[in-house]
């Protein structure tokens, strides 16, 4: 509401942040983002204001500037401690100052400080970033502007110097006291087929008849009430490309920016495996913290996070291959396991797991994922069954880097597939644990269904890994390439691979070209992709490729302000400052040095409220303040624990010819647990070997009578097994 004192929070405190304006420029698969925060001090006293906000983990923030009453002030990137010292000195000397920094514990949380904002003053703070856009399974490029920064659980660790520890106020999305606007321009030489969004956008306006450029914008009056998602479909996305960008040798004679840089984008034509992997140890780590009781999104009738996760877990359990091993862990402030150790996948163990799934609730307190991860990694490996870890979480944790480091330390013995559930899930955590352990990450929000994404990940886990990946260059004499990207260890069919390199030496004449090769092996076969490209670098005032290359390097080396190894901290700091890309070790600082006179009067603090999802406030005490004992519980007595190499004791193995037991899931129970999703209901009745019992439950879900089903089954099948329908549906192929 607008009152004479300005926009107010529920505490009747004026809010100096008036609006957020975002300009988005997408060229091919790279997004350039310019976000402007408009402040105005409508009070009679000078202000110091704080604003904590989310950004995507992949964003390379390279510019920060302030326009104060028409005067532009460009910030400098400094070592973080030095930047803080400059800011505190400026404030104490009554100078206007502006500070932008990445949180010390997570690279997807930022804090903006505005110090000594004079009464009546207006300031526009603009930060610029670039990022690669991920490719969805259906060929869409996905851009997300994070809006929601939900409270992060702090656990028992010490996070007093986190941005989130400033205790900035939170408000429901509908009560946000500032407005939001966004304008986007998209261009591609291959042509734009369509643009979709989860938010109300203006009709797409194509610029030119060839549809290589288009513009869209959020409709007027949009409330920043959800993450803004754009899906961009080009006519062709699987063409490999190489882009070469000019360096800046005059201004950086010895730095990272001196030489030209190259960005190589491969789309390897990886063939389908001749025989999928049927072995493996599949461990599902399910978030059961209080925040999982929140809805996935702000939308009406949005599914609760825990219910969506349970529904997805059922599909995954139904899709495992007979003979593999599996287990399910739930975690919060404490954790629980379905079985004392991973058990062999049979009809009986599957049904036991499904009974446990139905009982799962978001009742385990805070989001403490580190301990169950360590427990899982301590378990001895099962010979011939490599570990595949599936993590489902809303990511509301503070110690992001500690968790990523734990996964990274165990990367050689497993692959990790991660799923961020709901608005506000930490992109730093979800992307980070998948990246360091050779898996993939997915985000599920709004109407977006989790099942198809989870099943795609399972299908990838069942494929043999691409091995012996290498990138090599064929360049003219006198020119060499220095790789900047971390070594890629795993590739999956349909995935894109982006690598960066610096080109040093003498650049050849205009007509010269180079080649780059991607080589790998799959099931003993040697495969190769190659791209020929022009060696004439193109100028870019924003040095987009250099900064994306720097971000790729920083992602691999920067493990947080406190946790980055000493041997890497020096390189992180140098690369960050050379390229102007923010890191955990640096911060942007700007001081209004030409202010005519010091700011007068006592300084008053104002914290800009940040949005939370509807429903989060009701469970916040449950998962922010909970301190349950850290104890592992099991539903089995020690005497019944199987060894790691034996079958689950007391339960017959289907491969020995035993028929599966009659399923204990009825049609009515399916409808109660899984609503009107008939596909999920159908899969819930499926046996471990892929068959169904021909009974009234199956007939009811299919909308047929039992007599109709029996009539449709071939006579030979009925003669062999009158109670089962042996036609298997591969759930891994559903909706992919």
Regions found by a protein language model. Give the residues of each.
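Preference for long, amphipathic alpha-helical scaffolds in soluble/luminal domains
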Residues: 614-736
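Proline/serine/threonine-rich low-complexity linkers at boundaries of modular beta-sandwich domains
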Residues: 10-15, 461-469, 473-476
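Asparagine-centered strand-capping/turn motif at beta-strand->loop junctions
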Residues: 24, 38-45, 53-55
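N-terminal, polar/Ser/Thr-rich
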Residues: 1-28, 730
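Von Willebrand factor A/integrin I-like adhesion domains
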Residues: 352-358, 371-374, 424-468, 579, ...
């Amino acid at each position: 509401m607008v009152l004479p004192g300005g926009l107010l929070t529920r505490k009747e405190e004026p809010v100096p942040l008036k609006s957020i304006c975002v300009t988005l420029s997408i060229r091919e698969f790279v997004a350039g983002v310019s976000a402007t925060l408009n402040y105005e001090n409508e009070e009679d006293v000078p202000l110091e204001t704080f604003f904590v906000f989310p950004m995507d983990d992949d964003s390379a923030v390279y510019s920060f500037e302030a326009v104060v009453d028409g005067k532009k002030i460009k910030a400098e990137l400094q070592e973080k401690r030095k930047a803080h010292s400059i800011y505190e000195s400026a404030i104490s000397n009554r100078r206007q100052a502006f500070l932008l920094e990445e949180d010390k514990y997570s690279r997807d949380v930022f804090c903006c400080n505005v110090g000594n904002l004079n009464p009546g003053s207006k300031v526009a703070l603009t930060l610029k970033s670039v990022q690669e856009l991920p490719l969805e399974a259906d060929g869409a490029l996905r851009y997300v502007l994070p809006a929601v920064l939900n409270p992060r659980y702090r656990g028992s660790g010490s996070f007093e110097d986190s941005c989130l520890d400033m205790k900035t106020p939170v408000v429901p999305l509908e009560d946000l006291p500032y407005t939001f606007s966004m304008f986007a321009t998209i261009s591609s030489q291959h042509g734009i087929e369509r643009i979709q969004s989860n938010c109300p956008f203006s009709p797409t306006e194509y610029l030119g008849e060839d549809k290589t450029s288009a513009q869209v914008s959020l409709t007027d009056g949009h409330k920043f009430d959800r993450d803004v998602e754009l899906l961009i479909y080009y006519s062709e996305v699987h063409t490999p490309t190489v882009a070469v960008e000019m360096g800046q040798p005059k201004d950086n004679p010895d730095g990272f920016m001196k030489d030209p840089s190259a960005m190589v984008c491969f789309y390897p034509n990886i063939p389908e495996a001749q025989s999928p992997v049927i072995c493996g140890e599949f461990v599902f780590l399910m978030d059961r913290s209080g925040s999982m009781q929140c809805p996935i999104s702000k939308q009406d009738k949005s599914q609760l996070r825990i219910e969506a996760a349970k529904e997805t877990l059922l599909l995954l359990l139904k899709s495992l291959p007979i003979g593999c091993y599996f287990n399910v862990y739930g975690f919060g402030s404490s954790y629980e396991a379905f079985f004392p150790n991973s058990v062999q996948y049979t009809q009986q163990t599957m049904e036991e797991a499904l009974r446990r799934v139905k009982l799962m609730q978001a009742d385990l307190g805070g989001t403490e994922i580190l301990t169950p991860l360590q427990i899982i990694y301590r378990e001895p490996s099962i010979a011939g069954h490599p570990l595949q870890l599936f993590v489902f979480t809303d990511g509301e944790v503070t110690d992001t880097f500690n968790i990523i480091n734990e996964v990274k330390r165990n990367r050689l013995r497993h692959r990790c597939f991660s799923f961020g559930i709901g608005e506000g899930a930490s992109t730093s955590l979800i992307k980070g644990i998948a990246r360091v352990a050779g898996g993939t990450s997915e985000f599920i929000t709004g109407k977006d269904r989790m099942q198809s994404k989870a099943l795609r990940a399972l299908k990838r886990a069942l494929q043999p890994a691409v091995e012996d990946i290498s990138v090599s260059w064929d360049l003219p004499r006198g020119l060499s390439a220095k790789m900047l990207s971390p070594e890629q260890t795993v590739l999956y069919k349909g995935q894109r691979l982006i690598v960066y390199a610096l080109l040093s030496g003498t650049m050849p004449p205009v007509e010269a070209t180079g080649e780059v090769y991607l080589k790998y092996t799959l099931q003993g076969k040697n495969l190769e992709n190659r791209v020929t490209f022009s060696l004439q670098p193109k100028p870019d005032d924003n040095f987009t490729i250099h900064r994306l290359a720097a971000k790729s390097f920083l992602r691999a080396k920067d493990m947080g302000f406190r946790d980055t190894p000493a041997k890497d901290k020096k390189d992180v700091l140098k690369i960050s400052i050379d390229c102007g890309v923010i890191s955990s070790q640096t911060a942007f600082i700007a001081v209004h040095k030409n202010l005519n006179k010091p700011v007068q009067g006592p300084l008053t603090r104002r914290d800009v409220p940040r949005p939370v999802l509807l429903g989060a406030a009701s469970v916040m005490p449950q998962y922010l303040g909970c301190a349950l004992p850290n104890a592992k519980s099991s539903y089995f007595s020690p005497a019944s624990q199987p060894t790691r190499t034996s079958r689950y004791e007391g339960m017959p193995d289907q491969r020995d010819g035993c028929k599966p037991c009659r399923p204990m899931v009825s049609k009515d129970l399916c409808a109660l647990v899984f609503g009107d999703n008939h596909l999920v209901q159908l899969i819930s009745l499926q046996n471990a070997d892929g068959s169904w019992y021909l009974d009234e439950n199956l007939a009811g879900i299919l909308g047929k009578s039992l007599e109709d089903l029996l009539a449709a089954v071939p006579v030979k099948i009925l003669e062999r097994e009158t109670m089962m329908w042996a036609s298997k549906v591969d759930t891994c192929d559903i909706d992919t």
